[in-house]
Structure formats: C-alpha cells, structure tokens
Amino acid sequence: MMGNVVNLSEARHKTEVKAADLMDLAEYGKVRKQKRAELVPLKKARRVPIGPHATFYFESYETMWLQIHEMLFIEKGGPDQIPDELAAYNPLIPKGRDLSATLMFEIDDEKLRKSVLGRLGGVEETIFLKFGDHEIQARAETDVDRTTADGKASSVQFIHFDFTDDQAAAFKDFDGDVMLGIRHENYPHMTLLSADTKATLGADLV
C-alpha cells in the first residue's frame, strides 16, 4: 500500500479503488479523523431516508475508499485482506451510467426488526427512481440472495439504478421533482430527493 495522503476531492470520477490507491495503514491512522470529517458533507447529500425504517446511502468512489480503509484498519488483516475488500466494495462504485446505493433497514428493537424484515421478502425488486417521464427500476446485487426462502429480507441491500445515455442526460438536465420509492405491499413509501442530493447524484452520471 502507498503511504501518500490521498486527496479525495481529486478522485471524484474514479470508478474503481485499486491497491495502489490505498494508504499505508499507519499513515491512514494519522489522518483517519480528518478523512472521516472530509466526507461528512458528501455523505449527508447522499443519505436519503424513506419511511420509518429505511435509508438509502448512495455510494461513490470516496465513500468506498473510506470504507475499504476502515475495514483494513479495524480488522488488521494485512495485505491478504486487500483483495477481498476491493472485490466486496468496488462493485458499489458507480461506473458512469448508474447510481449505486446501500439500502439499510435500521431498527434497534430486535423484536420489531424481525417482524418488519419478516414481511419484506423481495423488497429489493420493488425499488424505483422516477423523474419526469422516466422510471428506472432498481437492480439488486446478485452476490447473495437478499431474501431468504421463508420470505425474510436482509437488513442490508445493495442496489443499482442503471441509466441509458438518454436517461442520464435527462436526469442531469431535469429541474423537477425526483422521486425515490419502494412499492412493496408491506412498505409502500416514497420520498422526493432534495436539490442537493439530486445535484450530487447527477454528477455521478458522466
């Protein structure tokens, strides 16, 4: 791993974290607080709550760069851990024609969490993004089944919204309401993206 301090603002449109992009962990430890603080405004614009329990966290090169470093720093698996972390998190970086998000159902009460998730099987297939005449159905990551055989949803879902060239151009130019929604019969909720969030996500479509 490299020992240089990385300027994340210069990495805005990178689509993959490479081993050469990683800091020496001793050096990362020195700037860890600074790097986490740098991403607070970015993460705020990428956080979209929907309904009482769900939150979308739209990912980017910067958020995944930080997440990979955090995993390496906390777990201390050494060089052998690096390929696994890159393989796990690189698919969540938008590639220029998609928006990528981690959807989390955040419920502290264990009994309530089990009850809610037990009724949300297949929720990953009911997510959409709508703007103007365009509606984009979310595509779930297929690394593992996010719904169990007995119909229980995972509390963490990884999803993508895939855009055509025309849809990407339309989204970047669109100045009306952008709706993010879930159509699951047991969690029918929708929300409008803030102007800040819409602009941030539009910049992901290059």
List each language-model region with its residue ranges.
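Long, contiguous binding/interaction regions
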Residues: 3-98, 106-206
